[in-house]
């Protein structure tokens, strides 16, 4: 992903807390029942992941990162924002232009993805998801 070697060394061991409560809160959804808060408690994940098959390193970035463990929140969020801006530069982004009978597959372990709006009143779409066994969280839970 073309990150400077110094930055790579600095981020190698960082752990982020991923929280659906955080990402929903960014959109204004802040009312959660106690059992929902328990079900959506933060999950710790290493920021840098090594793919178990290819051994390629990638950043595990998502809109639901709420902090970096051990960092003051403002600095953590500014740093994550900078990494997200870097990762979503046009040179790193694939945009699929759908045509009839297309099949698109990706490996969630190394891909940031986002759905875009589409005209569901006039366009027929068949979406299916397959999930194989996952490695689960990549950092000790605190």
Which residue ranges define each predicted feature?
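Non-heme Fe(II) oxygenase catalytic core, chiefly the N-lobe of the double-stranded beta-helix
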Residues: 3-103, 108-142
């Amino acid at each position: 992903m073309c990150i400077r070697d110094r930055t790579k060394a600095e981020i190698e061991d960082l752990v982020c807390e991923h929280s659906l409560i955080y990402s929903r809160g960014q959109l204004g959804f802040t009312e959660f029942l106690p059992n929902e808060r328990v079900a959506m408690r933060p999950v710790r994940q290493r920021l840098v992941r090594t793919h178990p098959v290819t051994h390629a390193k990638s950043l595990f970035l998502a809109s639901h990162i709420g902090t970096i463990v051990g960092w003051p929140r403002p600095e953590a969020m500014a740093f994550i924002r900078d990494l997200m801006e870097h990762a979503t530069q046009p040179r790193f982004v694939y945009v699929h232009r759908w045509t009839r009978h297309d099949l698109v597959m990706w490996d969630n372990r190394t891909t940031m993805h986002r759905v875009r709006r589409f005209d569901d009143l006039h366009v027929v779409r068949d979406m299916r998801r397959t999930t194989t066994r996952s490695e689960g969280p990549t950092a000790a839970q605190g």
